Amino acid sequence: MPKIIELPEVLANQIAAGEVVERPASVVKELVENAIDAGSTQITIEVEESGLSKIQITDNGEGMAQADVAMSLRRHATSKIKNQGDLFRIRTLGFRGEALPSIASISHLTIVTAADGEVYGTKLVAKGGEIESQDPISTPVGTKITVENLFYNTPARLKYMKSLQAELAHIVDVVNRLSLAHPEVAFTLLNDGRQLTQTSGTGDLRQAIAGIYGLTTAKKMVEISNSDLDFEVSGYVSLPELTRANRNYITILINGRYIKNFLLNRAIFDGYGSKLMVGRFPIAVIDIQIDPYLADVNVHPTKQEVRISKEKELMALIKSAIAQSLREQDLIPDALENLAKSSTRGATRSVQTSLPLKQTNLYYDSSRNDFFVTPETVQEDIKPLVSKSESSVSSVANKQQPTVKQAKRSADDSDSEHGKLDYKNKSKLKRMLENLTNEETSTFPELEFFGQMHGTYLFAQGQGGLYIIDQHAAQERVKYEYYREKIGVVDSSLQQLLVPYLFEFSGSDYISLQEKMPLLNQVCIYLEPYGNNTFILREHPIWMKEEEIESAVYEMCDMLLLTNEVSVKTYRAELAIMMSCKRSIKANHALDDYSARDLLVQLAQCKNPYNCPHGRPVLVNFTKSDMEKMFRRIQENHTSLRDLGKY
């Protein structure tokens, strides 16, 4: 008796549903994408109990002919592709012919549809993938699909559904992404009769952003645009002052399809450089138009993973588009808005009975204000990246040394905020180190210093109004740019080690490093296999001080394993960040007028005077208009959606 049998179609569909239909939001995604492919301009999504009880999608698309309705429930039945060649020219959102039969196999499904030119429409009812009835019906052109009792015959899947609020949040996210991908379609989302999302369908992406994220957010979005022979990149990104705590507000679209791509996310962060605070993420909608031949969407049934040819070229295009648009903006945050966002509810009002004034000293005391960036002060921090002197070498040689030395990973720096970074946690490093080297010179307002508060903040005025400067962040930026230039120079010479070092790795890392060893050789690190999962280092590059060999080699290897790249500049930039932070003036340090003015002059000469190396703002701005609003001299005007075109 044969052991291998062909599974019944309903069972096969239920198995496929395990990948295609993960939760109610998956049903919404697949059915709305079908509606978009049908040419709909209005789509209404109605759900009950976060989609577990009922999901209904109504559109005004081309509908289905009577003969096609039953066929749509057959596996791999589709109108999107006809032959193998079409698989490489996919411009529709759906093409596999799996979604509708998979959904039907785990729910009670009703389809009401009519095609243009048909006398009657069709109503089809199916339960568990089996068609129970199909009748003619009078209905307008378009399609209405109702999915009820989702997962009724797969209790294991139903058991592990999250809370109703969590499932609803996934549905809202799906509809929001599709609304941003297709601003020409008017979307309406209702849950238990309550409207959650509505977009106008005008085709204006900024209007769609306003409908989803709000008018205030839309006003702080910057348009980007760039193209080459293969790609067209457009969309909007938020100003650096408008960020979120996670990546969920980044939407990347390829030919109208929302995708997830780590490298393209990285290109967005690279475009911002050091303008983002560590741990903060921008709001972005990046629309990429690409020849279908360069994108393989047939990777996963959910079609959210796409393989892209010429991915590095696309990353460079996105990065330059964002960087160019931000260079054209005034990046000094509006202080009045920051105050409104950071105000504390229920804060007690302080009563001030007097306004004591302190006369500012008009002299310069170098002993009090050791903060000027000079070659001498830099030399104190940056030790020559050269070999030891002959005397030190001879003294080491006279001591008894083992034939090899076991390298150890260095302990974490005691300064948790500004200590050494872990290359295995690269999210901070990518934004805080690699991007710092790509900054370009920015225009900076001409400021006139006039005071200091609490030994921490400097006050200056300019044509733009009142400016408040964080003196520590300002000097940190000044010193960082100076240090970066000094330690960015790399000497590729090698020096023999008197005692070689052994570096031990896990089995998988050891194999990966053997394959990627040519990349380490490019930065003059030559590791040789030496026993089980161990490498030996017999010589080190001049740019690497001997006391940092162990930590530097391990960090460079960690960088290579995680990013497939290795960069001396990135590693040395970390040192520049640490030195600039530790050598900068701290809070509660009074500056005399000469020192404060000179700090502002040096800040104005920086390539990026707006943020410290960690991404914190250096200064904020109160405009004359802001001051007049605070003192009720003028009333704030409220902007409507129709005014968005002015920004």
From Swiss-Prot:
Keyword Nucleus annotated: no
Known role: This protein is involved in the repair of mismatches in DNA. It is required for dam-dependent methyl-directed DNA mismatch repair. May act as a 'molecular matchmaker', a protein that promotes the formation of a stable complex between two or more DNA-binding proteins in an ATP-dependent manner without itself being part of a final effector complex.
This protein's name: DNA mismatch repair protein MutL
Keyword DNA damage found: yes
InterPro entries for the chain: DNA_mismatch_repair_CS (IPR014762), DNA_mismatch_repair_MutL (IPR020667), DNA_mismatch_S5_2-like (IPR013507), HATPase_C_sf (IPR036890), MutL/Mlh/PMS (IPR002099), MutL/Mlh/Pms-like (IPR038973), MutL_C (IPR014790), MutL_C_dimsub (IPR042120)
Keywords of this entry: DNA damage, DNA repair
Renumbered residue ranges of the record's region Disordered: 389-423
Family from the record: Belongs to the DNA mismatch repair MutL/HexB family.
GO process annotations (BP): mismatch repair
CC per GO annotation: mismatch repair complex
Single Gene Ontology MF annotation: ATP hydrolysis activity
Organism: Streptococcus thermophilus (strain ATCC BAA-491 / LMD-9)
Stored Pfam families: DNA_mis_repair, HATPase_c_3, MutL_C
Ranges annotated as biased composition (Basic and acidic residues): 409-423
